[in-house]
């Protein structure tokens, strides 16, 4: 959805149509909630009631908040995080890897990582803006939107701003399929970047 939204905004959209789509989406929210699986409903309830430990998924978020909070400004040091090393924090190598960064490298480490991601997204947007053809620009914007969604979703759920999902943090989370997909999409960006200038033979 985020990829489609990014491409549509870049290609241009009638805001009257956009307004109607948003209104229909808001009206349809109750129906969407009733149609999703029970575990997904519990994740939404857990997000709305983070203090309720009886809701599955809240334990993960609580341990994530403890890990980030205990890291302080500079962190406990690499491989010295108690929540991580003693396995209090579930799925710490993929979904909640940002909490590990917060615990072991502190606020400074988290800010540095977010800064790197921000520059990464900025460079991709520059490539999209400088593309010589509309197709290449839309491809670059679509890939940028995908990376932006993954980054915001993963960090957001780690700090209790967004309901928990299984979205990984690009290039940081453990997982072959995640890294392979990210590298393939980055390849698309590099291909668009290569074609910004005319090649002379």
Annotate each language-model stretch with its function.
Residues 1-9, 24-26, 185-187:
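Hydrophobic transmembrane alpha-helices of multi-pass, membrane-embedded glycosylation machinery
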Residues 5-14, 119-128, 190-196:
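Structural signal for the C-terminal ends of transmembrane alpha-helices
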Residues 14-19, 127-135, 200:
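Interfacial helix-loop-helix linkers and transmembrane-helix boundary segments
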Residues 17-110, 134-135:
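Hydrophobic, glycine- and aromatic-enriched re-entrant/interface helices and adjoining loop segments
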Residues 22, 100-103, 143-147, 175-178:
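Transmembrane helix-bundle signature of multi-pass membrane transporters/permeases
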Residues 108-123:
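Selective detector of the "anchor" transmembrane alpha-helix that sits immediately C-terminal
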Residues 126-166, 172:
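Loop-to-helix entry and N-terminal half of a specific, functionally important transmembrane alpha helix
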Residues 153-201:
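A juxtamembrane structural motif centered on a specific transmembrane helix
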């Amino acid at each position: 959805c985020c990829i489609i939204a990014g491409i549509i905004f870049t290609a241009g959209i009638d805001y009257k149509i956009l307004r109607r789509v948003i209104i229909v989406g808001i009206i349809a929210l109750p129906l969407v909630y009733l149609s999703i699986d029970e575990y997904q409903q519990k994740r939404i309830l857990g997000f709305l009631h983070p203090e309720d430990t009886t809701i599955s998924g809240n334990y993960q978020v609580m341990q994530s908040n403890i890990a980030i909070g205990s890291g302080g400004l500079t962190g406990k040091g690499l491989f010295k995080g108690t929540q991580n090393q003693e396995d209090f924090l579930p799925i710490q190598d993929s979904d909640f890897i940002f909490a590990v960064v917060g615990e072991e490298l502190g606020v400074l480490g988290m800010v540095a990582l977010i800064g790197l991601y921000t520059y990464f997204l900025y460079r991709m947007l520059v490539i999209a803006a400088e593309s010589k053809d509309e197709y290449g620009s839309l491809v670059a914007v679509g890939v940028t939107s995908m990376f932006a969604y993954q980054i915001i979703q993963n960090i957001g759920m780690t700090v209790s701003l967004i309901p928990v999902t299984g979205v990984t943090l690009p290039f940081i989370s453990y997982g072959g399929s995640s890294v392979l997909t990210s590298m393939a999409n980055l390849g698309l960006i590099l291909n668009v970047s290569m074609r910004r200038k005319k090649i002379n033979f």
